[in-house]
Structure formats: structure tokens, C-alpha cells
């Protein structure tokens, strides 16, 4: 072996021996108080961990049983726990000067508890607040920081800087106080923040598995950390979500009846108060009601808007809902429902009964939206009709034609009021024979439509609430029956109650005798004033009768004239 090779080998052996021997002469646990102080001061929370050991080769201290205290206003249990954390340190000052210079953190499989209270505040909001006003995590710190935030002054930021903070394979449980149901759990959470400093903007990456198998990936920048409220830290990010089930994820109450699977691609910019977003959403298996079947076709949504976090309010500048070639546009505003003095929700404003900002019910937004669409192909909208459990008689379907609508959607999300005009042109109701549903005097008229009813025109103003549907100013042109005018209601239990007047003089489904009979039974005025019709039953099984009350009290001359005068 050559001389230089021997020297190199000896050097390597010596270095390895020294590295292996250092932990024998350096008690890593002596650095625990210094690290405790640094982390507790930086986070404004009590930070503790168990046994420490030095790993020279990875240039880190390996800590067992990490625990970070929660904000005592939320929970006495820890905010974060982990079996092991690797704390990167600079070895030279550590070994020779016993000085702890932190470089990075790698936390393995932590358990993190994220909690939101009724006002929308988060338990991580107080992270980073200075402990000068009290012990880390004490009420004094929280009260002082909250006071500073309300006065518009910025809390001082910790001088804590590291190259890397990494969370690997974590588990995050989201819950609310007061508690309602089980926590929503996100598994396999991975977070990376590079060049981290409280006072600077830094890049980060986040990924996790969502409940029911979906995934989320976020890349962007955070910072500087807001010293009074970490939840108000400015951020810019690109968010990609695959296979989101919002019911399983806890965003939608199962009792609302809405369910779907969605893929999202969203860009957001948050200045600490307002978030400006735009993006696209691809929706499959959409259900708008509990008793509905899933939409057979996907629905695509493109939107842009703003959201004010503290007030939990925002504006939808434009959202385009696309089903095939049909496009429906939505715009408007929303805000949180404020509780009344009795504790029940009130839509007055975004302040509570006591005037405290943020004392709002975040689960019940109040909407003020406009929904419009012009000349929408009815064939494309069949998918949405399925998702909304729209029932047509005897399982029939609309074929061809277009629909236009201009609706206003207002009120709390759980008790919306939808009003406005709807217009339908040149469609066919396939699979329903009107003539088989007409009873009483009308059945004598000889109406024959077959299993397809043509609807040339339909105009109606609707008002839809939880109590049912009110339809006013109905005007329809159905060639088999003539022109129809009137109004009616559909109850919350799907009971029909419509009163229409049919001008039958031009009805193609009636013979001349039928037209004359209608007219005669109505006192000779059927061709001009029309024949009253009553529709009851359900959308599945409508029952149509001629309203002949009082007809037989009229003169019998029109009836006798129908069959000719006395010879």
C-alpha cells in the first residue's frame, strides 16, 4: 500500500474514532435547558422533551418525547407531541463552547391538535407571541397580544432562524370548542419550511391524505409571521386537491344533503385579512339533496373571488358552472350569521350580540347571490336535475329545447329563498301521456297527446323555500291543450295544488266536438276566457281535473246548441 493511502486511511480511522467517542464524553442532556429556553421563547409555549443523545454523523441531537403546550384557552392537552425529533446543531460550538446553535428540526410522526372556537379563532394563533408578559402560553401573553392586535400594534417577533423545519408522516386532528362530534383527522401530513424566520417570508410545502382517501398538496410562501395572530400571517400558495369528499372532510354537514367528490386547483393570496382566490373545481357524483341520485355527468366550476377571514365574509366576482355546453353564472356576496342575544343565529351582521368582532356562526353563511343562464340546453341540464331530485311525472324526461333563468338566492344557507323567472322553449316531455291523467269533464273532450307532450313555451316566476315552491304568472303553450295561465304551489311534502285556465280553441289534441264541449260547459266562453283546470297529487302522479263547479248552474242553451236546435 502506498504511503499516501496509508496516511488517508489512518486519518479516516481517527476521524471515525473521534466521532464515535464524542458522545461518550459529551452528555447531550446538559443542553436540554438551553434548547427548552430557546424553543419556549420562540413559540411562546412551554416546550419539553425527554432524553437527548448526540449523533455526530447526522450533526444532530435526537430528542425523545417532544411536547409543545397548547393555548390554555383551548386545551390543557398538548398542541403537539412526537416520539422523536432530530434537532440539527452546529457541532463545533456545541462541543468546544457548549453553545447550542440550532440549524434545523425534523419531527417524525407528530400528533397535532388543531382547534377552532366558536368565534373562528384558532389555537395556533398565539404561537410566536413573546413570553415577556408572562410564562409561555399563559393567559397574560394571550391577553397582551390580543390587546396589541386590537390596537393595531405589531407584537415583537422572536429572533428565531433555522435552515429547515420538517414534519414527516404526521397526524392532524381538527376539532371545535365547544365540541361537536368527532375530530376530523388528516393522516400522512408532511410539511417542509426552508430558511425559516419569524420576521421573513419563507417557502413551504405541505401535503396530506384527506379523509375518505383524498390528497392535498400546497406549495407557496409564508411570512412574516404575524406576532399578534399567527393565523393572520400573509401567504401565497398554489393548492391542488384530489378526491376531496367535503362531507367526510368535515366541511359540509351530512344533514344538509349535499355530497360530491371534487378535484381542485386553486391559487390564493392572503394579506393577513383578505384572501383573493381563483381556481377551478371538477365535481363528480354530485348530489344536491338527500333523496337524489348522483349526477351522471361531471360538473366543472371556474371562479374568482375574495374572502375576509376575521368577518368570515366575501364576494364571488364570478363563478361559472359548466355542464357540457350549458353555462350558469353565479355572483354575489356571503357573510357569517351572527348569534342573537338569546344565542340563536341572527343574520343582522358579522358581530355578536355583545358587539364582539368575530362572534359569529361560521357554519351558517348568509348568501346574497345572483344565478343566471341564457338558452341553456335542457339535455345538458338533465344531470343537474338528477342531482337535485327534480321529479317529472311517471319518470318522464324533458328532451330538447332550452331554458333561461335569472334567479336571486338569499338567506342563511340552511333556509335559502330562491326567487325569479324561468323560461322554457321548444322542449318535449317524453314518457308521459297527459290524456291519461285528465279526469272529470275534461276526459270527455277527447284530448289525445300520446306519450310525448310538446311544450312550445313556458314562463313562470318561482319562489322556492324550505316550505315548498310557489309558482306565479304561469304561461304555457302546449299544442295538445292550448294556452294555459295560472299559479300554484308544491308543498314541502311534494303535494301539488295548481289552478290553471286552458284556452283550448287552438288545442291540437282536441277535436272540434271537444273544443265546443269545453266551451259549452263553460257557458259558451271557453274559447275566449278558457276552461279552469285543477292539478293535485304529486309530481310523480299528478291528477288533472276540470274545475266545473257552477258549470251546471249556468244556462243549458250552450249544451243543447252543441247538438243542434230542436226541429
Question: What positions do the PLM features span?
Answer:
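A short, amphipathic edge element
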Residues: 43-50, 259, 455
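An amphipathic, basic-hydrophobic helix/alpha-beta surface used to engage anionic
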Residues: 85
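Small-residue helix/turn framework positions
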Residues: 55-81, 101-130, 164-166, 171, ...
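N-terminal helix-cap/turn-to-beta initiation motif at the start of protein domains
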Residues: 153-164, 417
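N-terminal type II signal-anchor transmembrane helix
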Residues: 1-44, 566
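Intrinsically disordered, low-complexity linkers and terminal tails enriched in Pro/Gly
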Residues: 129-158, 353-354
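Gram-negative outer-membrane assembly/targeting C-terminal domains
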Residues: 542-567
Amino acid at each position: 500500500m502506498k504511503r499516501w493511502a496509508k496516511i488517508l486511511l489512518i486519518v479516516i480511522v481517527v476521524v471515525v474514532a473521534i466521532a464515535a467517542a464524542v458522545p461518550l464524553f459529551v452528555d447531550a442532556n446538559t443542553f436540554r435547558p438551553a434548547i427548552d429556553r430557546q424553543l419556549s421563547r420562540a413559540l411562546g409555549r412551554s416546550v419539553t422533551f425527554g432524553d437527548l443523545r448526540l449523533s455526530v454523523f447526522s450533526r444532530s441531537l435526537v430528542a425523545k418525547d417532544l411536547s409543545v403546550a397548547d393555548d390554555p384557552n383551548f386545551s390543557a392537552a398538548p398542541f403537539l407531541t412526537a416520539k422523536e425529533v432530530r434537532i440539527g446543531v452546529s457541532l463545533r460550538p456545541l462541543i468546544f463552547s457548549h453553545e447550542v446553535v440550532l440549524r434545523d428540526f425534523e419531527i417524525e410522526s407528530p400528533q397535532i391538535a388543531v382547534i377552532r372556537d366558536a368565534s373562528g379563532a384558532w389555537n395556533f394563533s398565539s404561537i410566536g407571541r413573546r413570553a415577556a408578559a408572562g410564562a409561555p402560553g399563559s393567559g397574560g401573553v394571550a391577553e397582551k397580544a390580543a390587546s396589541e392586535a386590537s390596537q393595531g400594534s405589531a407584537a415583537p417577533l422572536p429572533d428565531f432562524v433555522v435552515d429547515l423545519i420538517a414534519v414527516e408522516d404526521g397526524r392532524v386532528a381538527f376539532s371545535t370548542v365547544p365540541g361537536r362530534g368527532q375530530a376530523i383527522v388528516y393522516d400522512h401530513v408532511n410539511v417542509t419550511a426552508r430558511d425559516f424566520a419569524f420576521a421573513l417570508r419563507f417557502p413551504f410545502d405541505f401535503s396530506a391524505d384527506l379523509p375518505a382517501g383524498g390528497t392535498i398538496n400546497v406549495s407557496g410562501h409564508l411570512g412574516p409571521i404575524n406576532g399578534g395572530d399567527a393565523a393572520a400571517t400573509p401567504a401565497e400558495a398554489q393548492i391542488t386537491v384530489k378526491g376531496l369528499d367535503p362531507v367526510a372532510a368535515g366541511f359540509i354537514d351530512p344533514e344538509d344533503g349535499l355530497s360530491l367528490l371534487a378535484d381542485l386547483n386553486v391559487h390564493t393570496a392572503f394579506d393577513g385579512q383578505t384572501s383573493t382566490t381563483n381556481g377551478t373545481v371538477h365535481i363528480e357524483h354530485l348530489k344536491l339533496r338527500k333523496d337524489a341520485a348522483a349526477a351522471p355527468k361531471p360538473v366543472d366550476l371556474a371562479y374568482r373571488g375574495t374572502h375576509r377571514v376575521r368577518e368570515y365574509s366575501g364576494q364571488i366576482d364570478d363563478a361559472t358552472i359548466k355542464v357540457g355546453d350549458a353555462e350558469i353564472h353565479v355572483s354575489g356576496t356571503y357573510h357569517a350569521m351572527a348569534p342573537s342575544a338569546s344565542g340563536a343565529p341572527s343574520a343582522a351582521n358579522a358581530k355578536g350580540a355583545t358587539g364582539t368582532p368575530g362572534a359569529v356562526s361560521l357554519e351558517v353563511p348568509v348568501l346574497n347571490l345572483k344565478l343566471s343562464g341564457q338558452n341553456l340546453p335542457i339535455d345538458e341540464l338533465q344531470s343537474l336535475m338528477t342531482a337535485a331530485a327534480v321529479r317529472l311525472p311517471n319518470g318522464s324526461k324533458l328532451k330538447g329545447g332550452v331554458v333561461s333563468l335569472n334567479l336571486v338566492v338569499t338567506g342563511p344557507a340552511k333556509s335559502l329563498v330562491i326567487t325569479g323567472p324561468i323560461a322554457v322553449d321548444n322542449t318535449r316531455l317524453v314518457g308521459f301521456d297527459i290524456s291519461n291523467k285528465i279526469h272529470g269533464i275534461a276526459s270527455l273532450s277527447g284530448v289525445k297527446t300520446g306519450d310525448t307532450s310538446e311544450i312550445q313555451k313556458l314562463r313562470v316566476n318561482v319562489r322556492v323555500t324550505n316550505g315548498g315552491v310557489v309558482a306565479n304568472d304561469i304561461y304555457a303553450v302546449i299544442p295538445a291543450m292550448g294556452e294555459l295561465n295560472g299559479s300554484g304551489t308544491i308543498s314541502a311534502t311534494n303535494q301539488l295544488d295548481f289552478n290553471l285556465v286552458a284556452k283550448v280553441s287552438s288545442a291540437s289534441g282536441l277535436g272540434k266536438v271537444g273544443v265546443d264541449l269545453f266551451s259549452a260547459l263553460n257557458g259558451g266562453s271557453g274559447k275566449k276566457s278558457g276552461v279552469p283546470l285543477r292539478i293535485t297529487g304529486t309530481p310523480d302522479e299528478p291528477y288533472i281535473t276540470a274545475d266545473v263547479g257552477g258549470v251546471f248552474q249556468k244556462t243549458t242553451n250552450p249544451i243543447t246548441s252543441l247538438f243542434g236546435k230542436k226541429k
